[in-house]
Structures are given as C-alpha cells and as structure tokens.
Amino acid sequence: MAIRVLIVDDSATARTVLKDVLSKDSEIEVIATAPDAYVARDKIVQLKPDVICLDVEMPRMDGISFLKKIMKYFPTPVLMVSSLTQDGAQVTFDALEAGAIDYVAKPHSNIYDGIDEIQKELIQKVKMVASSNLSARIEAAKAKTSTLEYKPKATYSLAQTTNKLIAIGASTGGTVALAELIARFTKDTPGVVVVQHMPSGFTNSFAQRLNSLCEVEVKEAEDGDIIGRGRVLVAPGDLHMVVRRDGGNYRVKLGTGEKISGHRPSVDVLFNSVASHVGSNAIGVLLTGMGSDGAKGMLKMKTSGASTIAQDEKSSIVWGMPKVAYEIGAVDFVEPLSNIDVKIASLLSERK
C-alpha cells in the first residue's frame, strides 16, 4: 500500500512542485495539500495521512505551533520543509524538539530550479518518516522538557587535556537524542567528538543551542581544535572530521574528501580515525539514524580495544545505524538512550 502524504505549505508553487516530485514514486500517494494549518487540520481528521510534509513558515498559525497540536491531538509522523538559513536552522531545531521526525531544506534558489537537488532526499525521507518509531519520538519530546534545563556553564581550560575520548555518531532523530545525552555530561567528562548528519548551515546553530543548555562546552569544531575534558566538538556540516594525536593532546582535523557511506561528515571516517589514534582509550556511541554510516567504523573501534555502545530499538526514532552495527558484531552494549550516560560512566570508572 502506498504511503499517503499530506503537503502543508502556504506557497501554491511549493505545493505543486512537492506534489509532482513525490507523485513520481509509485510507493507514495499525495492524498491532499493545504495552504495553512486550519485547512490542514480538517484534512488530517478526514483523511488520516501516513506522513505530513509541513512548511515551517505559514500564515495564521506557524508550523511549530501547528506541529505541537498535531503531536498532542493527532500523532502523525511529520517531515518539516525548512529554509536553509540561520533563522531556518533555529526553527528547524524547535520543530525537531516539538516532535518532527526529520527535515528537508528547501533549495536556496527558486524551488522550480532547485528541486532536483532535493528530489532524491525528499522521497527517501518521506519513506523513512513513514516507517519511523513515532512513539519513541513522542517520548523523546517529553524527555526534552525535563532534561534540557539551563545548567551553570563550566569554565573550559585548554589545560584540561584528555586521555580518554568519547566518539558519538547520529543521524535521523539525533539532534534530540544528542541533546538529552550531552545534557547529562559534566565538566569532568572526557573529551567528546560528534558527527551528526546535518547541512553546513545548521551545525554551528546546533552546537550553540546545546552549549546554552549543557554544563560542558559545546562548539562546532575548527581545524586543529584540542579535544579536552568537559568539551564537545561537533563536526561542521559538509566536512569530514578525524582525530589525531599531537604530543600529549588529541586534536581534530577537518577536510573535504569524497562522501563516505553517503555522508560528509561521515561517522565511519571519525570512528576509523579514533580506532587508529585512540584505540582502547576510546568509547564509541552510535545513536538513532537511518542507514549504516558508523557501523564499520564502530567495528574497527571495537577491534582496536574500544568499548562500543548502540542505542536500543525502542528508544531510537530510526533504528538503522545502530542495528547494522549490532548485526555485524560491532556493539558491546545495547542501551536505551536514558541509560547511555550511566553506561559511559561505568566504563570510565572500570578503566581508571
């Protein structure tokens, strides 16, 4: 049976283009479109779509407010369609925290001219959103309310070197999962490096958002940054990030290079470098995400002596990357998101 999609966008042009693109795939049926939240509400009640493609900026009621109502009254998997701008990034994170499964960034140019850039991604993500774990998404949104409270900022010092290192990879659902996990880290947590699949315009905003909520320092990585205790470095969008040993320190190195496992930044690229340069002093964590990026790299980390943790299926929005890692024997521990920080602390205490 085809995936039944409702498109909600105030632009008639956007509605037409999105419908034309999605209708090209035989597994997707666009059952209706709506110009605003009020028309969309009636369509949802009447048609009960499998997936809603929702524009962020709309008249009468903005996309975030409407999204919250959808999650409360008509829980349905939602794919946000947002502009790739600084403001667009902030609103997109609001949407993900409010319950959206994922997002697609609208083309910079005229949507007619730029639709080819996102056609494959749009179709792929509609299918992924349709099969996602909506109950885990709703629980994650609830957990966000209790977890993401302001915490006093620890003062980071470059003198705080780290001999242990935590490497984390995530994709779909990862922004909320990372926020919940990193909010539990303290100033004494070993240095953390993160790859979250995200466009280049979004990663700095994401890091700043986490930094305002967490005790540890969170920043978008810059080439040559030192990895230190109480510090979390997030790989910039569209750049690979690797770890290198530099005397008594670990540093990150950024570069372009080809996409690996379909992504740049790639979790596999990060994990492979951690396996080579950190070995048994590392802990690898693979969170919710579509695809297989990070699985082979995690296996290499495990082979090098690192401990490895995968998020469990029940708490994952999309159990893709962790599942593949588990299936190839790369995972030591499968944990719910709420217990991953506890497992990390336990592993660190064992290795003192």
Swiss-Prot record:
Active site residues according to the UniProt entry: S171, H197, D293
Record-annotated Response regulatory domain positions: 4-121
Keywords noted in UniProt: Chemotaxis, Cytoplasm, Hydrolase, Phosphoprotein
4-aspartylphosphate modified-residue sites: D55
UniProt keyword annotation of Cytoplasm present: yes
GO molecular function: phosphorelay response regulator activity; protein-glutamate methylesterase activity; protein-glutamine glutaminase activity
EC number annotated for this UniProt entry: 3.1.1.61, 3.5.1.44
Described function: Involved in chemotaxis. Part of a chemotaxis signal transduction system that modulates chemotaxis in response to various stimuli. Catalyzes the demethylation of specific methylglutamate residues introduced into the chemoreceptors (methyl-accepting chemotaxis proteins or MCP) by CheR. Also mediates the irreversible deamidation of specific glutamine residues to glutamic acid.
Protein name per the record: Protein-glutamate methylesterase/protein-glutamine glutaminase
Name of the gene encoding the protein in the UniProt record: cheB
